[in-house]
Amino acid sequence: MTDEFPEQYREGLRLFNEEEFFECHDVLEELWSETLGTDRKFLQGLIQASIALFHFGNENFGGAKKLYLSARKNLDPFGDEFMGILLSTFLQDFERCFQELLDNTENYPTTVALRDELVPKIRATAEGLIG
């Protein structure tokens, strides 16, 4: 069943779950550049989510917030499941991870940090999709 998904996609998901967000971005961006249609918008959202987390972890809060909002805009329309992942679960976890930053009104917050226990994971609907 997982043969229907490109190897780059599976590798990108694996890297995301290992919190290798910049590397995830690189792998998925290569696939994104070759993709057409609705899958392209979905991949763009995953790329934005990975870089939002990368920025958050590096305390680039403005970049993190901006890319979080862009990722949500691109991923929200895809429903509960898409391209073999439990998207609604991921988006709930993604929002929970960013909630403190989103609620903060300071330009340069000093009390906000990416909390390891809140970093979202991508869960698959297809066995073996994420290695």
Language-model features: locations:
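Alpha-helical segment of the N-proximal tetratricopeptide repeat
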Residues: E7-E23
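TPR/TPR-like alpha-solenoid helical repeat scaffolds
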Residues: I47-Q48, D80-L102
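Amphipathic alpha-helical segments of tetratricopeptide repeats
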Residues: H25, E29-S33, R72-D80
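TPR-repeat structural position
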Residues: F21-F22, F61-G62, Y68
